[in-house]
Amino acid sequence: MIFFERYEILFNKFNRSYLTSFGVFFPGLTILFSLILYNLGDSSFSIFTHYLSHLGIGPNGSNIIFNVGSMISGVVMVCFFLNLSVFLIKKEVSIILVNLSFIFGFISSVGIFMMGLFPGDISQYLHNFGAGFFFFGGLAYCILYGISEWTAKGISKLQALSGFVVAFPFLVFIYFTNINFFNHELALEISHFSEWILFTLLMCWIIGHEFSMKKDRRLT
């Protein structure tokens, strides 16, 4: 509780609104620019044949944009989860539930940072380790933040349900990726495609929550 209070005091000294608004769009912009650069160098890229992290080993500078962007995004996401946690505490959500949600958000953010720090052509093992942090942490925080918002005062049930909606593609991706571990050809296209669906829905969830928090700050 004291940690979140000190964070709120620190960032109230800055114009946090502009910083966080840019931050939540940063991961999506990173992917977009990486995709453009990749396709300028190799037009074979497809959401059915490539994972997101293939951008980290791509041509034409797409790898640099993706990997540096991933590391910055990891830091940005920690700030997002801090903001969301402070927001929920003000809505009288259980501090234990908020702490658990933030812990898994932090774990997922570390995973994003690691995926940028260790692209597949440097260390596939460490890259996969970071990916595991991101996906399993993401599944957990979507569920936990969803439960937190369901119990919060002044937050719509629709917003709370969005966490469970995003948790579902996490499960789908993890399921098909595990199938591919044992049979590489059985569900490869579905695994690739489900990750892109997951990323799209997750970005919508993050941006939607940022706008919700901004709206709440204007009303208070």
Residue ranges and their predicted role:
Residues V24-F45:
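Alpha-helical transmembrane segments of multi-pass membrane proteins
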Residues L82-I107:
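Cytoplasmic juxtamembrane regions at transmembrane-helix boundaries
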Residues H54-V75:
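Interfacial helix-start motif at the membrane-water boundary
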Residues G105-W150:
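Membrane-proximal helix-loop-helix units in multi-pass membrane proteins
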Residues R16-P27, F66-S73, S101-S108, F134, ...:
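Hydrophobic alpha-helical transmembrane segments of polytopic
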Residues E8-G28, G154-L161:
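Alpha-helical transmembrane segments and their helix-start/interface "positive-inside/aromatic belt" motifs
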Residues L144-T220:
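Terminal transmembrane helical module of multi-pass membrane proteins
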